[in-house]
């Protein structure tokens, strides 16, 4: 080694740290996703290599997509493939904890494949050069890296004799297949699918080659690489073609292909020319799950209603705007279209506020999504919602869609408005003072002996879900009024007033009121209020979760019947519980046409709220099943509780039925043993 001046070492340390530190930012995330795609393909190639003798017996040439399908359905080979999937995070899971639940008895193939994947995710392809070959900054006596992942590009973290630096490896492409030819062919099939073809150069690899196919796309009239999405892996195949069924009209697609074997890859081909489907884009889907989010009362007695809906997941063209029509109805008969009122909201917005509606009235709302394709407007089917602003009729709301029967409205916030002023109790106009929203409650004294009152105020619900439990405040006053302070915007409150002494004839009186939204209040009063906390309504989360999932099995006359039971946690339910959704799935690696290993054959059933047991007949012996239970409420689904169970073996002389059948979860019998 050459002796260096002390100052040079410091300068080298600073420079190396700057240029070879851990990569960060969007580019690093893209590189990490690319490395993971290559690693899973190397993992798959290894599994095929281990079975190459068997594969050759079935196929004249193992470089055929049938070889991958064969491996997916072969007992040992499918176990090897299981860790190669991209659906699990190796950093958060140990190989033992991943493989044992799937293969409790024999998991050697899974474990060795998992350890190989773990190794290649941390160690880049190629070999470190000899320490004495390091030169320039790579020869600096510094510890600038600890792992290959800290080095950019293809560089590896290598020793130089007195430290570790990022260095260009040797034998980078030893045994690695050549890149495919960059020209890709696109064939649009009559079914609407797209077939992408490529060809390979002379293959120097004796191991099976996995082709990783990625794509990106942009929306618009013209192709654009600047506005394109990130590259996403759409297929891994051993064939030199892939057929894609999720091609959308109006998108400009680009593809690239990499050839990978167990030793590594030379990277992707250059991005292909742009491809766009010749199909015309479809009209947007009709808005779904239209519902009432909130109803609030105005000072003049009118009512504001907030309507919300679910945005479509992936239309051919993004929704440009929504048309909202509403009209007063009589006995659910809609008035003529000429008298309908209309609003337009932006495409990304999923709610609208209908202002100035009359109390104790029926209304019908129609909603339609609109997209633009050049000069053409594409419109969805209309969906409608019938609702009432009268409190007595709040449970009679109906949701209808064109050509579909009415569905029950999921109403997370019960329809409410300010009650008619009672004889004794009234609510004043909300006002803003001392940086607080306040309101005055006042009442009439009917007895001169009443000189002290209890005032209970209860926060019932808020549109923005900012309630800290159910906040209840009790105060005493000698006056015939009380100013309620520190109120929240867009919330429903209940106020109850009763005499401090129970001997009085004055009975407890209650009144409901709804505070205005921050933005509406600010606009009317011109107050300087910070409305940053007011957001688009977020429905209260369902916190209730099934617990203590257990299973027992009864074997009778060659049939296995499973009894699954659970308990419910004592979480606060913001909405009434309507039942349970139970999904059970067979986790299998058996040979099934067009199926992947660990494919899930699932069935689902809705149980009433008082049913905590599910009975499933005709289960398969010695099979792993996944049970998933969710609490259902009027406001949505709770978090799922998932557990794996394995059915017992059948005695050798007993036949078994190989198919799952629909069942009815009744007549639960206590099982002999639990799992």
From Swiss-Prot:
SUPFAM superfamilies: Elafin-like, Fibronectin type III. One of its GO terms (molecular function) is serine-type endopeptidase inhibitor activity. Glycans are attached at residues 65, 203, 294, 465, 548, 559. May be an adhesion-like molecule with anti-protease activity. The gene is ANOS1. PROSITE patterns: FN3 (PS50853), WAP (PS51390). It is found in: Cell surface. Residues 388-402 have a biased composition (Polar residues). The keyword Iron-sulfur does not apply. One of its GO terms (biological process) is cell adhesion. Keywords: Cell adhesion, Disulfide bond, Glycoprotein, Protease inhibitor, Repeat, Serine protease inhibitor, Signal. Residues 180-281, 286-392, 418-515, 545-652 form the Fibronectin type-III domain. Gene3D superfamilies: Elafin-like (4.10.75.10), Immunoglobulins (2.60.40.10). InterPro entries: Anosmin-1 (IPR042447), Anosmin-1_Cys_box (IPR040957), Elafin-like_sf (IPR036645), FN3_dom (IPR003961), FN3_sf (IPR036116), Ig-like_fold (IPR013783), WAP_dom (IPR008197). One of its GO terms (cellular component) is extracellular region. Disulfide bonds join 43-77, 47-71, 80-99, 84-95, 110-114. Mainly expressed in neurons of the central nervous system during the second half of embryonic life. Expressed in mitral neurons of the olfactory bulbs, striatal neurons, Purkinje cells of the cerebellum, retinal neurons and neurons of the brainstem and spinal cord. This is Anosmin-1. Pfam families: Cys_box, fn3, WAP. Residues 121-170 form the WAP domain. It comes from Gallus gallus.
